[in-house]
């Protein structure tokens, strides 16, 4: 597993991650990109645990996602299966597991304060923390996409699934966008990546 992980996470984090996974009956699978999630955890019928992580994540997002999923495993083992997936038990576990990694030998100086702030009260997805999500995306390979907040008001754009929208105004933190085919209004996070059509 060490050989595999060293291709995906910062070198200084490998030993700690391997210790977290030691003595756990867990399979870690690296998958092709899934648009709706960075990773997931589940207990298999065989009694083993499985963690899957998208292969296209940059090393920092991969590490955060891996620790996020390990926190699900540890919370399940420590508190049972009736806890909320991103409830208090998981949050405390995630904070505790992530703390040793919020270090300048692992993350860049510009990410550290954003991570420290995020982990005061971690959310189900780091993408909902707009500042952290944008800072992490700077380490992604270029993909030619445009962020919603960069799309001019009234312009049309297309999502990864082919659905087309017209950008409307901002409502508190998210943007109202109208689906062209149905006229339905959807809210988009500012850091959603889209293809600009006009």
Predicted features along the sequence, with ranges:
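Metalloprotease/metallohydrolase-associated module, dominated by Zn2+-dependent proteases
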Residues: 3-6, 11-44, 50, 56, ...
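Conserved short loop/helix modules at catalytic or binding sites
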Residues: 59-62
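Active-site recognition of the HExxH zinc-binding catalytic motif
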Residues: 64-77
């Amino acid at each position: 597993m060490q050989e595999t992980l060293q291709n995906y996470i910062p070198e200084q984090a490998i030993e700690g991650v391997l210790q977290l996974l030691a003595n756990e009956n867990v399979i870690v699978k690296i998958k092709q990109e899934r648009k709706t999630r960075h990773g997931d955890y589940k207990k298999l019928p065989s009694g083993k645990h499985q963690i899957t992580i998208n292969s296209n994540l940059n090393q920092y997002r991969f590490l955060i996602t891996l620790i996020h999923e390990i926190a699900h495993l540890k919370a399940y083992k420590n508190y049972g299966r009736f806890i909320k997936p991103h409830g208090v038990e998981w949050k405390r576990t995630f904070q505790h597991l992530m703390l040793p990694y919020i270090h300048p030998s692992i993350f860049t100086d510009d990410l550290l304060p954003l991570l420290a702030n995020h982990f005061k009260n971690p959310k189900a997805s780091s993408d909902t923390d707009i500042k952290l999500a944008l800072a992490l995306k700077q380490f992604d390979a270029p993909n030619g996409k445009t962020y919603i907040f960069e799309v001019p008001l009234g312009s049309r754009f297309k999502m990864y699934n082919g659905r087309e929208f017209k950008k409307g105004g901002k409502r508190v933190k998210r943007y109202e966008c109208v689906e062209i085919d149905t006229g339905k209004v959807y809210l988009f996070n500012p850091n959603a990546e889209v293809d600009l059509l006009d």
